[in-house]
């Protein structure tokens, strides 16, 4: 029996509970693709073939099987992944769910639009769409249904905070989040955004002078000049360390905490790095079809969820030091899970039989270095607050 058969059987048990498979063979192929991705560490159908345990003798047979799966119109990505991620979030608990939306360009030809759930310094995919589009900027109409689909997958009654970068700063989005989905939001906006203050001439965010360490909080104002929207709240600051300017719009009253909350958005960029240069090497893929790429993202999403949960369980079981050389946690949960799976293959360890994410507070937050942690505590701000609420 191949060493990978144990992982195959465990994934078959975890993923096979869903009744959405049009053909159970589609599930079997998907599992071998996930195993190939984890074991090879890269996107390569040819490199995945060596890890398959089946009656087929030739590598080309496995490669063709994977390729057919990626281009099979019967493989409905969201219908297959929805029950998996819904079950993964079902035991989240009472903690706030932080969702992050972002885009990633592939070969300057395809745009991957994704909504992920923030999880302990990284992010796990919830829903996505791949379109042929030569820009990372997309209109609200393009991703509106993606947000609606995400809403259906979350636990009923969950408190949600949504975050996105400047490319998503649209009043249509803000209204949709508040009125249709019932989510809170923190969105970074551009410095040319118009701010309307009662009794004052409309001005742009760039007109507010900010020295290093200055922060301005504007509560209850309106934004945009042509079609005023609000009331919203704004947080403006110039970072005393990086010297960067930050402009955040929120549906809730802003404070210095708003900047820390928005900073969590960068966890999705770490997720994209895990899929690209820092992990699975997505950009090495030879797939050049939006629909096939979306199916490939399903393979990535399941691998990410599986490894992250394995890492979560490793820490919870008190076994982190078996796979992490740092005194304090220095690796992501995905990386810890990846190392644990290697131990399963080569040292006879056992997999943890779950795909559920825990919303509990991280008891072992990652520390890049003591110097980095200390530097983040050196930020000091001088805050001015203005309220325009009627």
Tell where the protein language model's regions lie, with residue ranges.
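DNA-recognition alpha helix
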Residues: 45-56
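Single, function-defining residue in the core of a domain
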Residues: 1-42, 50, 80-82, 92-97, ...
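Major-groove recognition helix of helix-turn-helix-like DNA-binding domains
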Residues: 59-72
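Short, basic alpha-helical nucleic acid-contact segments in DNA-binding proteins
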Residues: 69-83, 88
């Amino acid at each position: 029996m191949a060493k990978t058969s144990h992982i195959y059987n465990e994934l078959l048990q975890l993923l096979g509970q869903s009744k959405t498979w049009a053909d159970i063979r589609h599930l079997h192929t998907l599992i071998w693709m996930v195993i190939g991705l984890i074991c090879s560490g890269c996107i390569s159908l040819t490199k995945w073939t060596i890890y398959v345990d089946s009656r087929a003798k030739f590598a080309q047979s496995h490669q063709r099987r994977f390729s057919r799966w990626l281009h099979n119109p019967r493989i409905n990505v969201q219908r297959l992944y929805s029950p998996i991620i819904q079950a993964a979030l079902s035991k989240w608990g009472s903690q706030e769910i932080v969702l992050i939306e972002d885009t990633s360009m592939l070969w300057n030809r395809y745009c991957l639009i994704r909504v992920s759930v923030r999880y302990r310094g990284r992010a796990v995919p919830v829903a996505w769409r791949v379109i042929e589009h030569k820009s990372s900027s997309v209109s609200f109409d393009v991703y509106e249904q993606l947000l609606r689909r995400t809403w259906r997958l979350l636990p009923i009654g969950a408190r949600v905070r949504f975050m996105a970068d400047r490319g998503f700063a649209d009043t249509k989005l803000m209204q949709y989040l508040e009125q249709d989905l019932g989510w809170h939001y923190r969105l970074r906006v551009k410095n040319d955004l118009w701010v309307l203050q009662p009794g004052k001439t409309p001005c742009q965010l760039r007109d507010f002078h900010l020295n290093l360490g200055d922060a301005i909080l504007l509560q209850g104002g309106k934004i945009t000049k042509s079609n005023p929207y609000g009331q919203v709240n704004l947080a403006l600051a110039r970072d005393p360390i990086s010297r960067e300017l930050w402009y955040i719009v929120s549906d809730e009253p802003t404070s210095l905490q708003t900047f820390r909350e928005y900073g969590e958005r960068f966890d999705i960029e770490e997720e994209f790095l895990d899929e690209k240069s820092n992990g699975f090497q997505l950009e090495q893929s030879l797939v050049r079809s939006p629909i096939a790429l979306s199916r490939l993202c399903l393979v990535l999403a399941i691998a990410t969820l599986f490894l992250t949960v394995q890492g979560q369980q490793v820490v919870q079981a008190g076994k982190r030091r078996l796979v992490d050389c740092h005194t304090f946690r220095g690796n992501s949960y995905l990386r810890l899970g990846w190392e644990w799976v290697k131990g399963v293959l080569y040292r006879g360890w056992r997999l943890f039989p779950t795909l559920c994410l825990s919303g509990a507070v991280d008891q072992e937050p990652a520390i890049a270095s003591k110097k980095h942690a200390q530097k983040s505590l050196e930020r000091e701000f001088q805050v001015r607050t203005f309220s325009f609420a009627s």
